[in-house]
Amino acid sequence: ARLPHAILFHGPAGIGKAGFIEAFAQSLLCENVQSDGQACGACASCGWFVQHNHPDYRRVRPEALEDEPAGEGEEGEGDKKSKSTKAPSKEIKIEQIRALADFMNISTHRQGLRVVVLYPAEALNMPSSNALLKTLEEPPPGTVFLLASNGLDRLLPTILSRCRKFGM
């Protein structure tokens, strides 16, 4: 069976969708997937994933969530900034979606797959939704988008139509 280029996992808030798609992303990038589909946790790819620096993985989420653990956090300089005058955004901004363009235009490193995790999908504002839609309409080869949402009614119908949907 061929993997869809975009999968949207949806269900009530707090059931673990973000953790699930992070684990799914790791298993897609793992070099020695276990018989149960889980990532091995020991290969070079899993090592990079756990250290939040896998070259074929990107996570997109609002700035307001970046202090929470769950994947590719930007550790280092960003954590040492003094209190900013601007509150972290609760939206996924167009700049974040545009930043994926460079990532998607370079060749992949290990398995040939490139994985983008995006949550919560309803945090996409209108400009970022439209930018993502362009990518979903013409997905780069070997790229898989894993999205999570608490409410399908808050997403553009055109984005919904481009994703395989799984209720959780």
Q: At which residue positions do the language-model features occur?
A:
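Clamp-loader machinery-focused feature within the broader ASCE/P-loop NTPase space
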Residues: 1-127
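Helical "lid/switch" subdomain of P-loop NTPase nucleotide-binding domains
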Residues: 96, 116, 120, 124, ...
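Conserved adenine-binding aromatic site and its adjacent loop/helix in ATP-hydrolyzing domains
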Residues: 102, 134, 161
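Conserved catalytic/switch belt of AAA+ P-loop NTPases
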Residues: 105, 130-147
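Small/polar loops that bind or transfer phosphate-bearing groups
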Residues: 120, 147-148, 167-168
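A short helix-turn-beta junction within AAA+ P-loop NTPase domains corresponding to the substrate/partner-engaging
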Residues: 158-168
